[in-house]
């Protein structure tokens, strides 16, 4: 399989975050292509635009995308998601839920798919959008897959450090330091604008993420 792994952050983020993410992927002999962009005033929308850019510019047949504060805990994640998306009709990744709990979707923190699937779904934009379902970055892609009877594989939550968020369909809370399938770790809210998260929590999340990376590197 011709697979590309990507992530995104803004240039004002603590550079150690991208550095440590890269170190973890190096540990597993995997290359992650990190898009580092100048920050804009609309980070949520910018995230979607950069994902669009990654898809347009990528040369690979299969794409796996991580948030900058998301890392694998074991190499097994790679074998697992590659097997899942190799049929060219499966969108696979972390389970997320709309703000009002009306709809589950694949979360932008970690997901993978084939270019064939993306094209067959009409090359949906990854832009964040507002709707009755409080649409998030990858929700439109998820919805198109469902409409066309494609396959969705959700990576389920197996642990979390706190319970900031909630998925009603599974009656499960999760938050900063969430682990999926015992294979993927996502810190959450490490690069949000400070208007969304106080500076102390912002720094705490960064430090916790770096500590987790160090644990993985020593394992």
Language model regions located:
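A structural signal for short, well-ordered beta-strand segments and their strand-loop junctions
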Residues: 64-65, 90-94, 151-157
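Conserved catalytic core of nucleotide-sugar-dependent glycosyltransferases
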Residues: 71-144
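Active-site acidic short loop of glycosyltransferases
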Residues: 58-61, 87
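Short, solvent-exposed loop/turn segments at secondary-structure junctions
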Residues: 10-13, 39-41, 69-71, 97-99, ...
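Residue-level recognition of beta-strand->loop/alpha-helix junctions
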Residues: 34-38, 95, 156
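Short beta-strand-to-loop acidic/aromatic patch adjacent to the donor-nucleotide binding site
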Residues: 61-71
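C-terminal catalytic/acceptor-binding lobe
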Residues: 133-219
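N-terminal anchoring/stem segment of glycosyltransferases
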Residues: 1-49, 53-59
């Amino acid at each position: 399989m011709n697979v590309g792994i990507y992530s995104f952050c803004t240039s004002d983020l603590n550079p150690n975050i991208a550095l440590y993410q890269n170190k973890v992927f190096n540990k597993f002999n995997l290359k992650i292509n990190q898009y580092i962009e100048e920050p804009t005033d609309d980070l949520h929308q910018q995230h979607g635009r950069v994902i669009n850019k990654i898809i347009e510019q990528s040369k690979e047949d299969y794409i796996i995308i991580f948030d900058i504060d998301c890392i694998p805990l074991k190499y097994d994640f790679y074998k697992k998601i590659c097997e899942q998306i190799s049929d060219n009709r499966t969108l696979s990744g972390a389970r997320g839920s709309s703000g009002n709990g009306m709809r589950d979707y694949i979360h932008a923190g970690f997901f993978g798919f084939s270019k064939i699937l993306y094209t067959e779904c009409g090359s949906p934009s990854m832009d964040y959008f507002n709707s009755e379902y409080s649409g998030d970055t990858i929700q439109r892609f998820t919805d198109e897959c469902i409409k066309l009877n494609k396959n969705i594989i959700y990576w389920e939550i197996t642990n979390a450090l706190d319970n900031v968020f909630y998925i009603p369909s599974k009656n499960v809370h999760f938050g900063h330091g969430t682990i999926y399938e015992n294979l993927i770790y996502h810190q959450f809210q490490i690069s949000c604008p400070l208007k969304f998260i106080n500076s102390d929590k912002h720094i705490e999340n960064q430090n916790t993420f770096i500590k987790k990376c160090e644990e993985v590197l020593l394992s």
